[in-house]
Regions:
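Pyridoxal 5′-phosphate
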Residues: 1-342
Length: 342
């Protein structure tokens, strides 16, 4: 028997997602840009999927851009906000020290282009406050980008409060919601979110497909040049089967969110309680404001990779950091950000 405990890295695709994808592969296989009937059936499925995602986020369908995943969505959001800022002479960007590398590496690129990036320090419980954001905003701030929930330690950030600060100050607010979508309630209107990224494979949808919410009126920079797909904002024939699967998975996750939260949170707390009894162990991240399915601990004197191999031999699949850095021997930037020693 295998115990899969690596759902922050990716999730098993649900039957709901598979059932939505198969007709798109077998029947509605046309190019959605084609005018013939097969193409238009694909276009209709694309439209319905866009409406489904928009419903789950409480936005308009025209505000959803489909992408290849969360990293592309993050890149497009940040580069677009930077372009707006450059035109206005505002070259200051605020983020946090424990963002996903899709954010941090894009910010490094923007620094080389002349932007000043300010990474807010993270409290030892893995939290950043709205007050920190408010105190950091300047006259030349063009963007605040703060993740909805951390992918390693599971901390849930006060997104609504941060969004309210940004809206009051007139600063664009982007959140990487890759770990939150399908697991936490998202309402881009109530939470004052201008741009939001998500990825299908984090909530039992397919890999290689994601979405970017962009509030109406915000101009986007094209990260991929080519055709006029996605209203000219993301070139390339749309991955209709993947998009259909992602939309179905998100709708299903949102419909069962509360019952899943109660069940998974109970399992999480039971596991944390048991593992915390191991000598020289410590839980990372906030215990109250935490993703339902996240458990992250440090064991003093234990090398992470060796522990993972032993767990795998025992039939337990887990990770010692984010999947995007699994080939690196560098210490987790997230754990360093909250003050954990190497």
């Amino acid at each position: 028997m295998t115990v899969y405990a690596d759902n922050a890295a990716t999730t098993r695709m649900s039957r709901t997602a598979l059932d939505a994808m198969l007709p798109a592969m077998e029947e509605n296989y046309g190019n959605p840009s084609s005018l013939h009937s097969v193409g238009q059936r694909a276009a209709e499925l694309l439209m319905k999927s866009r409406e489904t995602v928009a419903r789950c986020l409480n936005c308009q369908p025209r505000e959803i851009i489909f992408t290849s995943g969360g990293s592309e969505a993050d890149n497009q959001a940040l580069l677009s906000a930077a372009a707006i800022g450059r035109r206005k002479g505002k070259m200051h960007i605020i983020s946090t020290a424990f963002e996903h590398h899709a954010i941090l590496h894009t910010l490094k690129k923007l620094e080389k282009e002349g932007f000043q990036v300010e990474l807010l320090p993270v409290h030892e419980n893995g939290m950043v406050s709205a007050r920190q954001v408010a105190d950091a905003i300047r006259e030349d701030t063009c963007l605040v980008t703060v993740m909805f929930a951390n992918n390693e330690i599971g901390s849930i950030l006060p997104i609504e409060e941060i969004g309210a600060v940004c809206r009051e100050k007139g600063v664009l607010f982007h959140t990487d919601a890759v770990q939150a979508a399908g697991h936490l309630p998202i309402d881009v209107q109530a939470q004052h979110i201008d741009m939001l990224s998500l990825s299908g494979h984090k909530f039992h949808g397919p890999k290689g497909v994601g979405a970017l919410y962009v509030r109406g009126g915000i101009p986007l920079v094209n990260v991929i040049e080519g055709g006029a797909q996605e209203r000219g904002k993301r070139a390339g024939t749309e991955n209709v089967p993947g998009i259909a699967g992602m939309a179905a998975a998100l709708e299903d996750a949102c419909a069962h969110m509360e019952e899943n939260r109660v069940k998974v949170t109970a399992l999480r707390d039971r596991l944390i309680q048991g593992l915390s009894k191991i000598p020289h162990s410590a839980v990372n991240g906030d215990l109250e404001h935490r993703l339902p399915g996240n458990v992250n601990l440090c064991f003093e004197g234990i090398e992470g990779e060796s522990l993972l191999l032993l767990l795998d031999a025992a039939g337990i699949c887990a990770s010692s950091g984010s999947a995007c850095t699994s080939g690196s021997l560098d210490p987790s930037h997230v754990l360093l950000a909250i003050g954990r020693p190497h």
